[in-house]
Amino acid sequence: MTDPATTMSWVQVIVLSVVQGLTEFLPVSSSGHLRIVSQLFWGEDAGASFTAVIQLGTELAVLVFFAKDIWRILTAWFAGLADKSKRNFDYRMGWMVIAGTIPVGLAGVLLKDLIRENFRNLWITATVLILFSLVFILAERRGKKTRGFEELTMKDAVLMGLWQCLALIPGVSRSGGTISGGLFLNLDREVATRFSFLLAIPAVLASGLFSLPDAFDPQAGQAASGLQLLVGSGIGFVVGYISIAWLLKFVSNHSFAWFAAYRIPLGLLVMALLGTGVMAA
């Protein structure tokens, strides 16, 4: 259990919210970065609950950025429920998002205590940052990247949903896990990225709402006021929206493995800081 801590300062809220917005959609692990920055500059963990709540801001960025896609999928899904003749690809996509969300939903509930306490050790975060970078490189090399968006199947959705479960460990990255899974399934890099965003919507939204009461409790990390959470979510929204646009443009003509070139040195740096006592795990 995290020891009771002081309330968060505004500087801390702003810095962590910018970090959240920048890293939530990049395959570098937002939870890992928040954990590292909190410990390095403030000497304590902001907490999994604070992280989950400010993710609601970045979640809103996804909803706005993909509003047309989401609306098309939702209307097709409801139309398909009412009329079998209207069951097109978007109708099936609705079911794929639901099916892909079930694994991480079950894992999140069953492993809640483990996620909030044991998994947040910085030695684990640093190690995973390095090891999962190798998965990125392997996914890029093994994946044929030939399958388009309309070639997605229910099997793909479930398998990518299982990959998303790995993101419960700080250092993996939600997008990193699901996109890697998509590449191993031979999906085009941009297709895997777009579906990764859609797949994250229910999971992140549920996680943020579920963690909202705990975000005010110092026992769950540092306590934040309602206004701080609101401002933090707003910052996360703006920075997150920019991050989404940049990532989709980047992956269209750049290897996913480039992120490993950032993650591996970061993991080694964190290990060095832990080993020398500059940071506590």
UniProtKB/Swiss-Prot annotation:
Subcellular location per the Swiss-Prot or TrEMBL entry: Cell membrane
Residues annotated as transmembrane: 95-115, 119-139, 152-172, 195-215, 227-247, 256-276
Keyword Membrane among record annotations: yes
Pfam families, alphabetized: BacA
InterPro entries recorded: UppP (IPR003824)
Reactions that this protein is recorded to catalyse: di-trans,octa-cis-undecaprenyl diphosphate + H2O = di-trans,octa-cis-undecaprenyl phosphate + phosphate + H(+)
GO BP terms in the entry: cell wall organization; peptidoglycan biosynthetic process; regulation of cell shape; response to antibiotic
Coiled coil stretches, renumbered: none
Keywords on record: Antibiotic resistance, Cell membrane, Cell shape, Cell wall biogenesis/degradation, Hydrolase, Membrane, Peptidoglycan synthesis, Transmembrane, Transmembrane helix
Record's miscellaneous remark: Bacitracin is thought to be involved in the inhibition of peptidoglycan synthesis by sequestering undecaprenyl diphosphate, thereby reducing the pool of lipid carrier available.
UniProt function note: Catalyzes the dephosphorylation of undecaprenyl diphosphate (UPP). Confers resistance to bacitracin.
Protein name: Undecaprenyl-diphosphatase 1
